[in-house]
């Protein structure tokens, strides 16, 4: 695999970020394996149209934490979401490199590793799960490479988990 350029995570705080999210979520190649609500594009469009830029992170972080995956120059190329679950110590991670021309360069792995560090070391989260479609071999390999282990089947998804105890 080719080596990825450095990436960093930041809050979704710009109108351009919202435009990118909406664009990515309209791409069937990007969303083919995502488990997102059908109304998410409408919700994001409404936020982009009505919420001032400084308030975007507040709205996107109401149910967990939301980050843009950015190249060194600040260009957003994907996102990571840590969503609260019914278990207070567990969050679900959802991730996507929205720029499909950048798939296979290691950006996803770098983003997941940074997210795990942030979650475990800075936010005090104890466990993170990822629900992955079994057909999504790339995402399954990524989860294993980042320390997730197969936990159980939940509907049409396999659930993988990483915990502070296992890192």
Each language-model region and where it sits:
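Terminal output helix/cap of sensory domains in signal transduction proteins
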Residues: 53-56, 116
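Acyl-donor (CoA/ACP) binding surface of acyl/acetyltransferases
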Residues: 1-32, 66, 70-167
